[in-house]
Amino acid sequence: TRTDSSAASDVYKRQLLALIIYRIGTHIPVPGIDPVKISSLFDQNQGTLLGLFNMFSGGALERMSIMALNVVPYITAAIVMNLLEATTPSLKKMFRQEGEQGRRKRTHYVRLGTLLLAIFQSMGFAIALSSQGMAIDPGTMFIFTAVVSFVTGTMFLVWLGEQVNERGIGNGISLIIFASIVSGLPSAIGQSFEGARQGEISLILLLTVAFMAILAISFIVWVERAQRRVTVNYARRNPNQMAMGQASHVPLKVNMSGVIPAIFASSIVLFPASISSWFGQSEGMEWLQEVSLALSPGQPLYVVVFSILIAYFCFFYTAIQFPAKDISDNLKRSGGFLPGIRPGGHTEEYIDNVMSRLTVWGSIYMIMICLLPQFLIVSANVPFYLGGTSLLIAVVVVMDFMAQVQSHLLSSQYQSLMKKANLKGFKR
C-alpha cells in the first residue's frame, strides 16, 4: 500500500542521510594538520598496512579527518567485552539474565571502553603527528586539539551507528564499515585502469583480479547461504494440536559467526602495525619498523597471525553467541527432541559436535577468502588494497541488509493487513 511504501521510504531516507553525514564527516580535517606532508606520507605508503588502515577509515586517515579512527576503538572495546563476558560468570549473568536492563549495561560498558581506547589511540596519533612534523604548529595545543577532534569523531560515529540500529535497518556499525570500504572503490578502479593504460599494470592481470573477485563473491554468497539442518521432532501432547506432532529442524549455518572474526582479526593486526607505522621513525624505535614490515600483507608472520586470529574468533564467537546448552534447553522446554538422541546432555553434546565441525569448515573458508585474494593482489602489484577481508565484509553486510529489508517489508505488509482486518471488523 501507499502507507507502507511511504514508511519504508522514510526508513531508507534516514539510512541514506546517516551515510551522507558520515561521508561528509570524513572530509572535515583536524585543525592544524599540514595537508601537503600528509599527502606525501600516504603516497609513499600505498599498498602497505597504512593503506589498509586508510581503507577501513574510508579515506578519512589520508585526509587526517576527525573520523580518522573510524569505529576501530568501538570494535576493540566490543572484543574486550566479549572476552570478559565469556570468562566472567557474574558479567555473563548480568548481561543475559537481566533482559533489556542487562543489554543497556553492556552497551554502556562498551561505550565507556570505546571512549578510553579512543583517547589512548588519539594521543598516540597526535603525538606522532606532532613529533614527525605533520602539524603546522606542533606542540601541546595541537596535541590537545587533535585528541579532542579524533575522540569526538569516533564517539559521533558510534552514536550514528546506534541511531541506524534504532531508526533504520541493519547493523549501523557494519554499514559504516561497509561504506568505508566501498567509498574508495571508484577512484581505486580508475587508478588501476589508468595504470593499465600507461603500461604500469598488465591488463591481463587486472582482468584476472576482477574475475577472481567475481568468483570470490559467488563463493561467499554460496557458503553464507549453506545450512546443516538438524531434524527436530515434537511429542504430540494434545491430539488437537497437530503442530506438536510434526517434525521441524534447527538450521545451523556453515559460517555461524558471520563477518565478526574478520573484523576482529583485522582490528587486532592493524592496531600494533599502525603504532609501528607512526613511531618507527623515532630515535631508538627502529625495531618498530621491522615489526611493521613483518606484519605487512603477504608476509609469513602476517599470514600466520591473521589465520590464527580468524580461526580463534570463529570458534570463540560461535560459542558465545550460539551456546549448544541454550539450544538444547530451548528444545527441551518446547517439547522437542532429536531422533535417536536423549534430551539434555546427549542433545547438547551432539549439537556441540555438529557446530564444531561446521565451524572448522567455516574458519577454513574465511581464511581462504581473506588471504588468497590478497596474495593475488600482492603478486599482481595492484596499486590499491581490496583484499578478501574487505570483500567478505562488503558481501556479508549487503546480504544481511537485504534480508532485513525483506523482513521489514513483510512486517509492514502484515501490520497493514491486520489494520484492514480490524477496521472491517469494527464496521460490522
Which positions does each model-derived feature cover?
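N-terminal cationic and glycine-rich segments that engage phosphates or anionic surfaces
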Residues: 9-428
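Positively charged, low-complexity/disordered segments
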Residues: 1-8
